Amino acid sequence: PDELWVVARSGDKLRALKEELPVPVRALPYDLTKQESLCAIAALLAEEQPDVRILVNAGGYGKFERFEAIAEEDTAGMLDLNCRALTLLMRAVLPYCSAGSIIVNIASVAAFQPVPYGAEYAATKAYVLALSRAVGRELRSEKVRVLAVCPYWTKTDFFGRANKEGVITHFDCMYDPAFIARKTFAAMKKKR
C-alpha cells in the first residue's frame, strides 16, 4: 500500500500530521542539516526498497539581514538544508524512482532576482532552480520529472524565523500555502 514518508525536526508536528491525514504516514523526525539524518534516510531507503512516485523537497532555511551581518551558523544552515540536503535526498531517492516518478523541489521567486537582505537565501534558491532544471534534463529519457516550484512569499512560520530582525518591513502579498499546493499539484499533473 502507498505510504507517505514525512521528514521534519518537530516530532509534535509529525504526530499531528499523522493524525490528520487519511493515508498511512511514516513520521521520520530528522534534522536534514545533519549528515547522520541523511545517512539514516538513505539506509532506510536501501532497506525498504520503496517504489518512490513523488519526492517533495520543501524544507527551507532563510535569514533576512545585511549580508555581512549574517551569522556563520545561519549561512551554514541555509547551504546545508536548501542545497546540500536537497541534493543528497534527490540522489538517495533516484535509484527507487521509475518512469512517471516526479521530484518536486521548492525553490522561490527569489531564484530569479537580487534580494537585498536575503542575498544568501536567494542564492540557495537559484541553486535549487538550476539543479532542478539540469537534473530534469538528465532524467528525461527515464521519464522521471523534476519540477522546481518558485512561489512568491507564502504564509508559513518561515518568515517569523527568517525575518526575526525585521529588516523586511513590507511584503506586497503573502500567498496561502494551500494555494501554492494546488498550483504545484496542477503542475505535477501536466505531462511535460
Model-derived features: positions:
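Conserved glycine-rich Rossmann-like NAD(P)H-binding loop of the short-chain dehydrogenase/reductase
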Residues: 2-16
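Rossmann-fold cofactor-recognition segment
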Residues: 21-36
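Conserved NAD(P)H cofactor-binding loop of Rossmann-fold oxidoreductase domains
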Residues: 58-63
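Substrate-binding pocket helix/loop in short-chain dehydrogenase/reductase
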Residues: 66-67, 71-77
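Active-site helix of classical SDR
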Residues: 90, 124
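SDR active-site lid
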Residues: 136-192
